[in-house]
């Protein structure tokens, strides 16, 4: 499935914030679907550090949200995040090669239950893990949002 034409040069779908630069600014590399698991290399740039050599928790959550959502596109379905829970197990280092893995735990109707871990590339022990619910995007999803925001800005909340 095409991601609305918003891919990097290699064909990887990109979010709205990254389309203009043609790469993932969070540091996520090419997503690969291998059986039931989506994997991607990721490296936290030191601009996202919280403490010395440690990634900010917001960066970690953003990477989970981004890659877990894009993993459904690899399976042919565009989704939106309904909920995301992150467990921070160990400090996530900056400027180190990491791997994120995403698994589909359950899928029924529009609901996709996903789990994910981030780990060092050379170590299987998770540094952080996430689980969440993604919903298949209905036609007109973003148009409805824009209409609602236009009404809000005009003082007509819906």
Predicted regions and their residues:
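HotDog/MaoC-like acyl-thioester-processing domains
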Residues: 1-7, 92-94, 105-158
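Hydrophobic beta-strand-centered segment that forms part of the acyl-chain substrate-binding groove
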Residues: 66-99, 104
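Short coil/loop residues immediately preceding or within conserved phosphate-binding loops
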Residues: 15, 81-83, 113
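Short beta-strand micro-motifs enriched in acidic
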Residues: 32-33, 103-107
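Residue-level recognition of well-ordered beta-strand positions that form the cores
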Residues: 41-43, 85-87, 101-103, 117, ...
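Non-catalytic linker/capping segments at the edges of enzyme domains
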Residues: 1-46, 155-158
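A conserved, well-ordered hydrophobic junction motif at loop->secondary-structure transitions
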Residues: 39-63
